[in-house]
Amino acid sequence: MSSRVILKSELLEMILEGAKRLHPKESIVLLRGKVEKEGIRVSDVLIPPFATYGRGFSSFPGHMLPMDFSIVGVAHSHPSGSLKPSVGDQNLSMGRIMLIVGFPYAGKENARVYNKQGESLVLEVI
């Protein structure tokens, strides 16, 4: 698997703004994209149906999602500011990658991306 994730700056701004608006609750969105030679390229952000946003958690019923092989991962927020995935994050992640954004949601410095094993990947914002 690639160790690099490529994300347009507009998409990162959208994820950060959504997290900021829901703060102090956690936000969650799906990441659509594709695996390419140079890395995993995220092309779109989707709001999962029937998502729940709470203090210390966010979730959605996976069985309510249509079959979509373009989902490469999930992005969610940590209102605490921590950018490290919890055991729960790793166990409940969907797809190949997990993007975590943390308070104060100001920019790339408040975002980290991981694979399903919790290993840090390179986040390239273009």
Enumerate the predicted regions with their spans:
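Conserved beta-strand-loop surface patch within small alpha/beta domains used
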Residues: 1-71, 79-126
